[in-house]
């Protein structure tokens, strides 16, 4: 592809699926605070008046799941019965079991370096030089729009905003480089009394224009703001939410492939999460070192086995080295065994709830250790 149009979407922290992700990761963080070796596979379901937390957890500590759920929902912004969902009075049900011993025997090991993969599967990591964060521009800016919406809502700058929202950014590419924004779609839940005309003007002037590069906005850019005309009913009242249902929002906005496994609610022995973070770390350092303009990494595993089954690199014709040469460099300088990934990226720290909204990649927070560019020099 040389000249094309590409679209990615993001959703707010008040979107039902993201609420579920955040609850699952908050449970995980609370366990890791007191039991860094805890095994967690936590799934959340949210719907009208109800939150159900289930999964498999093996830990030496106790966590108050009901309190975690209520606190997180209120923090997100569902703290008013008029919104149709209120963290202080919704029902909370938990159904938690221990991790299967058949799975545990594959990942339990006195030598942490030889921890086996918690399951079979493949993961992908991606980086490109379209943005300073080495993320694809469409998903990067879609996330920024949602962060801006949440900021204006929580700071009461636009007091009629409510928690549920979605964004979509369509970019025009020429010679494989983003040159203009073709369209912006932004839907936000709102107070019933706000007029559509005032809402559209405020969203464009207060959310979109301060967030997106002005050089990419022009007279041909299309703005589609709350296209149905009304978005009062939102959150779990309008749609059920489930952990792991926004895997493309969580990753690269469709610009790269995805192994299919979600991230949230999983401790780092689950390669769906830890190896995907490692794959991003590798791809970002490859691009950061100038070895390629775009890089996609695939790593695959077998349950109970520490060493990867395969490692694959694709640079889409943007590297002076062959894909095979880059793969050789990767295997020389990156240890992709789960135990080594956990140790190198410090993945037993309680850092996960902040990953559960606005993307797991391309973030500047120090806890996002997989975003470090500390292997650039040895790859050059």
Swiss-Prot record:
Subunit composition and interactions: Homotetramer; dimer of dimers.
PANTHER family in the cross-refs: S-ADENOSYLMETHIONINE SYNTHETASE
Metabolic or biological pathway, per its Swiss-Prot or TrEMBL entry: Amino-acid biosynthesis; S-adenosyl-L-methionine biosynthesis; S-adenosyl-L-methionine from L-methionine: step 1/1
Family membership noted in the UniProt record: Belongs to the AdoMet synthase family.
One GO BP annotation of this record: S-adenosylmethionine biosynthetic process
Function: Catalyzes the formation of S-adenosylmethionine (AdoMet) from methionine and ATP. The overall synthetic reaction is composed of two sequential steps, AdoMet formation and the subsequent tripolyphosphate hydrolysis which occurs prior to release of AdoMet from the enzyme.
Binding site for Mg(2+): 17
Cofactor(s) named in the record: Mg(2+); K(+)
Protein name: S-adenosylmethionine synthase
Example of a GO cellular component annotation carried by this entry: cytoplasm
Organism, scientific name: Rickettsia akari (strain Hartford)
Main location: cytoplasm
Binding site for ATP: 15, 164-166, 230-231, 239, 245-246, 266
Listed GO MF terms: ATP binding; magnesium ion binding; methionine adenosyltransferase activity
Entry's localization field: Cytoplasm
EC number from the UniProt entry: 2.5.1.6
UniProt catalytic activity: L-methionine + ATP + H2O = S-adenosyl-L-methionine + phosphate + diphosphate
A Pfam entry, by short name: S-AdoMet_synt_C
UniProt keywords, alphabetically: ATP-binding, Cytoplasm, Magnesium, Metal-binding, Nucleotide-binding, One-carbon metabolism, Potassium, Transferase
Designated gene of the protein: metK
Superkingdom to which the source organism belongs: Bacteria
Gene3D superfamilies membership: 3.30.300.10
Enzyme class label: transferase
PROSITE patterns, per database record: ADOMET_SYNTHASE_1 (PS00376), ADOMET_SYNTHASE_2 (PS00377)
Cofactor note: Binds 2 divalent ions per subunit.
Residues the entry annotates as binding L-methionine: 56, 99, 239, 270
């Amino acid at each position: 592809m040389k000249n094309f149009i590409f679209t990615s979407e993001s959703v707010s922290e008040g979107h039902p699926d993201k609420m579920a992700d955040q609850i699952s990761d908050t449970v995980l963080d609370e366990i890791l605070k007191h039991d860094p070796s805890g095994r967690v596979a936590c799934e959340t379901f949210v719907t009208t008046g109800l939150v159900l937390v289930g999964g498999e957890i093996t830990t030496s500590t106790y966590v108050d799941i009901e309190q975690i759920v209520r606190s997180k929902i209120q923090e997100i912004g569902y703290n008013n019965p008029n919104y149709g969902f209120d963290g202080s009075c919704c029902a909370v049900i938990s159904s938690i079991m221990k991790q299967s011993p058949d799975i545990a025997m594959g990942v339990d090991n006195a030598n942490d370096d030889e921890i086996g993969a918690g399951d079979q599967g493949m993961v992908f990591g991606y980086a490109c030089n379209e943005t300073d964060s080495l993320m694809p521009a469409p998903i990067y800016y879609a996330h920024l729009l949602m962060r801006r919406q949440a900021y204006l809502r929580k700071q009461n700058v636009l007091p009629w905003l409510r928690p549920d929202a979605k964004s979509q950014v369509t970019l025009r590419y020429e010679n494989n480089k983003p040159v203009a924004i073709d369209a912006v779609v932004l839907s936000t839940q709102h107070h019933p009394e706000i007029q559509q005309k005032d809402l559209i003007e405020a969203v464009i002037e207060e959310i979109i224009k301060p967030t997106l590069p002005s050089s990419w906005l022009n007279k041909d850019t299309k703005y589609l703001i709350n296209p149905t005309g009304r978005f009062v009913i939102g959150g779990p009242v309008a749609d059920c939410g489930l952990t792991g249902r926004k895997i493309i929002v969580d990753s690269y906005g469709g610009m790269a492939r995805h192994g299919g496994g979600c991230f949230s609610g999983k401790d780092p022995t689950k390669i769906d999460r830890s190896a995907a973070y490692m794959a991003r770390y590798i791809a970002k350092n490859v691009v950061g070192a100038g070895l390629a303009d775009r890089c996609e990494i695939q790593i695959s595993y077998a349950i109970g086995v520490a060493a990867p089954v395969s490692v694959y690199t694709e640079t889409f014709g943007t590297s002076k080295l062959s894909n095979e040469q880059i793969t050789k460099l990767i295997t020389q300088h990156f240890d992709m065994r789960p135990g080594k990934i956990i140790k190198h990226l410090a993945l037993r720290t309680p850092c996960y709830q902040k990953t559960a909204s606005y993307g797991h990649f391309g973030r500047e927070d120090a806890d996002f250790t997989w975003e470090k560019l500390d292997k650039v020099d040895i790859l050059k």
